[in-house]
Amino acid sequence: MRSKNQEQLLLLSISAAMAALSVVFTRFLGFSAEGTPFRFEIGFLPIAIAAYAAGPFYSAAAYCTADVIGSFFSGYAPNPWISMAQVLSGILMGVFFKRKHSLPRAVICFSIIAVFVEILIKSPVFVYMYSWTWGFTFTTRTINALINLPIRIFIYYFTLKAIKKPLDQLL
């Protein structure tokens, strides 16, 4: 049995490791078409694992940390609006996934994130940042979300299915 401090340290360590992995998966293994809002990456996966292991607070902090650190690797300053959108995504994953794993939860969670975070929240940020038209931004963000949605569900569901038992033993 772990003490409360040991439990918090374990969850913090898992979240920090997942934030670092998210930076690698997003900034170094991801693809972002120059001059467009298209982005294909699997940086969400470590955050979803942190959400399963530690819950909404830790996954939100991990996603925000990964976004801020990752922005420096991309050569620009962090955007607080994008970082807050990532925090919201982390919270949603933490609420849906904390110690719970099912396909319906993955579908619902990633669908909410796709519609509300990726399209409705991030689109105005891209319009403001890059002076893109609303139509172009919403269209491309919607296409991006529709392409990423099944990929994210599939990757998350089967990855967690593969690591769930050892992860549960660790926790």
Identify the residue ranges that each predicted region occupies.
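Loop-helix junctions at membrane interfaces
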Residues: 1-171
